[in-house]
């Protein structure tokens, strides 16, 4: 998508700068729509909702580390201590939420991000976690 939600056809052979621009344009549009939905959920829910907003991957550019950087945002009403930490990965998001809201006892798993290439989909590589 373009920044206003318009359909965009990307040319074949786009370089990293072109992918970054296309990714930024998509994010601008998605941010606008996501905020509308989140405001609606919070404003019309009879009970404060738990909201998790996650991306499955970052920008699809040649820098593999960018591919592993995702959005991981939470709205967790009523909790004084969430247990969230800067290096959390999605594998532990729901475990913490179930433990905090529903009395679960799910142990946390290793926070790891795996990547594979299209031509070798089952050859996984562990990505370094560069979260601050």
Give each language-model segment a name:
Residues 1-132:
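Catalytic domains that recognize anionic headgroups
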